Amino acid sequence: MSARSFLSKGYVMSDSNQMDEHANASEALPISQRPASTAPGHWVLARVGKKVLRPGGLELTLQMLSEAKLTGSRVVEYAPGLGRTASEILAARPASYTGVDKDPVAAKHVRELVGIRGTVVNADAADTGLESGSADVVIGEAMLTMQGEKSKKAIISEAVRLLAPGGRYAIHELAVQPDTIDEELHTQIRKDLARAIHVNARPLTCAQWSQLLEECGLVVDSVHTAPMALLDFSRNIRDEGFLQTLRIIRNVLSDRELRARVLGMRKTFRTYQQWMCGVAIVAHKPLKGEDHDAQ
């Protein structure tokens, strides 16, 4: 049975112990006191049990991390959120791990997850306070999309400052496609996304994402895309596992307010599915004397 038919039939699973666990976990999340009707979409999805919140899914994240060459590297991660990617980074045995999150609740959560294997600072990605040239890899996922042009450039410029020459900046963001997309349609997608997820999302085309990185002084090494299928049943099975996907469905069905938000987001995602994708880009800071325009 597909998730769509499952939800449309209105099945409700009841398990008081598991529902209590869901409630307790939700209380520990950032913005937990905000009602589901007004909370940012990614934290609404976290409340129902989603752990993989990246537009291109876990597979695209893993491909990006592989190309970023983490083993033995000094890694800084912007906005680690729930710490799902942090766990993958640590599994790659970096020389060091530093998470940077401006939300104190998220920072505390990831700090507990990382433990003695790294550090987490409560700071803004555009002004981390970390030492220049102190990172070999900077990673950021699903965060630049939520920023305006000025903030996008400020965050990327901070990553460039943190990187040693030759260091890699890896991003996983939401993109619109094709690169020649009609501007009116692009604008409508932005507006409808903002209404659905309650965040002023401003996705770019893949070409625009690459251009933005280059304008900030980086050299793009690789670009990969994957379908934007964040709320598709099959994607959730792959990203979350079968049992966790069932828990997510149960949590959605057991809370009317959460259900309305999730179904609203799902409707918007499906409406524009052919024009959206997840994009992962790895770029590097040029070595001294390297021709920035050489591709």
Predicted regions and their residues:
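Conserved class I S-adenosyl-L-methionine
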Residues: S73-G81
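Conserved alpha-helix/loop element of class I SAM-dependent methyltransferases that forms part
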Residues: R54-T71
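Class I SAM-dependent methyltransferase SAM/SAH-binding core
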Residues: L82-D127
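A short glycine-rich, Lys/Arg-flanked "PGG" loop and its adjoining helix->strand segment in the class I
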Residues: K153-R168
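Conserved catalytic/acceptor-binding region of the Class I
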Residues: R168-M228
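A short acidic, Gly/Pro-enriched loop at the edge of an enzyme's catalytic core
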Residues: A126-V138
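Class I SAM-dependent methyltransferase Rossmann-like catalytic core
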Residues: A39-L58
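Conserved Class I S-adenosyl-L-methionine
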Residues: S222-Q295
